[in-house]
């Protein structure tokens, strides 16, 4: 690993530690836009760098910080509320003993909540559940970035192998052209064999250029995601392979999207309780000391009182808020079912695609073996004038089609495996990024 890579890994680990400890706005280094050249990289390193750069991670981390601040705001309801107050201007009080004209007043007041039938506690619990939902959404964002990066990585590997196979096919066609030239020079075949082969080579060169352009595009996309341009990309880890019938063993309780929806449902339930508690009174202690400046004399007014605020009739506003909260809870509950449904659908489709790609890959492998055997036989028979140049070119086309089909099927399979692992929130552990369940955030090594 290069010095640049070590530095970036350290920076990313530090950034995640900051989020875990402070739950505040995130990575100061995620705004980097530069792309650094490196000799080689792996899928794990690419994902780590992408998470360090992706703005969506910082965005969701900031949302988590907002959630924590909302908890602090709700908890402040139990703290004493202290304020200074003052006024100036004409004020007159008249009673049986006469009139008192005040010109100014100032003082200090304090209010302490005693009991509110769950209003404040439910608000705290509601904000806590919402904060936990934001935490799981952050986990989901990390998984989404990992999936996006892994799919881009697979595309780079796909076009790297296709380009290499196309170049090998060009070289094979050049060997055929050389053989045709030798036979033409010896007078045992016409020069049209060589010309026909050159035409086929030109067509294959166009395919090479096409895959070169596709590879450059894939490398550019991955470079923007990771912030580095590697000369070599390691193979996709084999442990990403999808197990048969694994879709029937999905543990939804460990999937961030489901857990985020469940916590939003829990938050909505506390919202219902908060709305219902508005029917009940609020008991508080109020105290104050106020100085009045009057024409006749100045004096202090001290007070300490137990205050009760009990709603009697508000035009149905509280009942309407309860119904709104119950509707929000029903919506949140449906989101839990939707999250499970989305996970199952994505995982099921990915598993089916994986199985299909494995089958196509095996068929391509068998086709390639047959084409390679036919190539050797046809070359020998061509030198003995038992085969035409068209037979030789046809078998080279068969070799190319089998090779490209095998490569395409292989990387279609890896894309499906990545989609499956992301659906069940197992992508990062499979590539070596361990997750700390207690902290509910990835612990990157």
Residue positions per predicted region:
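Periplasmic alpha-helical coiled-coil/stalk elements that build and connect Gram-negative outer-membrane
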Residues: 2, 141-254, 350-353, 357, ...
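Acidic, low-complexity, intrinsically disordered peripheral segments
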Residues: 2-4, 8, 27, 35-36, ...
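Bacterial N-terminal signal peptides
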Residues: 13-24
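Bacterial Sec-pathway N-terminal export signals of envelope proteins
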Residues: 28-83, 226-269, 273, 312, ...
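Small/polar-residue-enriched beta-strand and adjacent coil segments characteristic
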Residues: 42, 81-141, 259-340, 346
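Amphipathic alpha-helical coiled-coil segments
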Residues: 59-74, 141, 145-168, 175, ...
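Outer-membrane beta-barrel domain signature
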Residues: 89, 95, 101-102, 206-209, ...
């Amino acid at each position: 690993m290069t010095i640049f890579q070590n530095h970036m890994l350290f920076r990313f680990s530090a950034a995640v530690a900051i989020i875990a400890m402070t739950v505040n706005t995130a990575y100061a280094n995620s705004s980097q836009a530069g792309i650094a050249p490196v000799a080689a990289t792996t899928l794990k390193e690419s994902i780590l760098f992408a998470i360090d750069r992706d703005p969506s991670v910082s965005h969701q981390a900031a949302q988590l910080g907002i959630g924590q601040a909302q908890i602090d705001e709700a908890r402040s309801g139990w703290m004493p509320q202290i304020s200074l107050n003052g006024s100036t201007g004409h004020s007159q009080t008249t009673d049986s003993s006469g009139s008192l004209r005040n010109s100014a007043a100032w003082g200090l007041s304090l209010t302490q909540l005693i009991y509110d039938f769950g209003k404040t506690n439910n608000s705290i619990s509601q904000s806590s559940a919402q904060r936990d939902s934001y935490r799981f959404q952050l986990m989901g964002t990390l998984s989404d970035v990992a999936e996006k990066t892994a799919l881009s990585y697979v595309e780079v590997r796909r076009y790297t192998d296709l380009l290499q196979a196309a170049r090998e096919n060009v070289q094979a066609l050049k060997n055929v052209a050389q053989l045709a030239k030798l036979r033409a020079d010896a007078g045992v075949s016409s020069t049209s064999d060589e010309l026909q082969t050159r035409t086929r080579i030109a067509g294959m060169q166009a395919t090479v250029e096409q895959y070169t352009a596709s590879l450059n595009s894939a490398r550019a996309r991955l470079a923007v995601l990771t912030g580095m341009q590697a000369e070599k990309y390691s193979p996709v880890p084999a442990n990403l392979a999808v197990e048969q019938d694994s879709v029937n063993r999905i543990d939804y309780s460990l999937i961030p999207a489901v857990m985020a929806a469940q916590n939003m449902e829990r938050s909505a339930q506390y919202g219902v309780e908060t709305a219902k508690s508005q029917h009940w009174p609020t008991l508080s202690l109020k105290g104050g000391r106020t100085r009045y400046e009057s024409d006749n004399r100045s004096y202090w007014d001290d007070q300490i009182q137990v205050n009760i605020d009990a709603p009697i009739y508000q035009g149905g506003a509280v009942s309407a808020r309860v119904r709104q909260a119950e509707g929000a809870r029903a919506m949140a509950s449906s989101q839990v079912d939707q999250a499970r449904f989305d996970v199952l659908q994505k995982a099921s489709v990915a598993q089916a695609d994986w199985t299909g790609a494995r089958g196509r890959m095996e068929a391509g492998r068998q086709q390639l073996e047959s084409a390679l055997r036919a190539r050797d036989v046809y070359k020998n028979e061509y030198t003995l004038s038992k085969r035409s140049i068209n037979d030789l070119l046809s078998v080279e086309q068969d070799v190319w089609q089998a090779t490209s089909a095998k490569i395409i099927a292989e990387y279609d399979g890896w894309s499906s495996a990545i989609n499956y692992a992301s659906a069940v929130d197992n992508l990062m552990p499979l590539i070596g990024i361990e997750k700390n369940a207690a902290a509910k955030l990835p612990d990157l090594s």
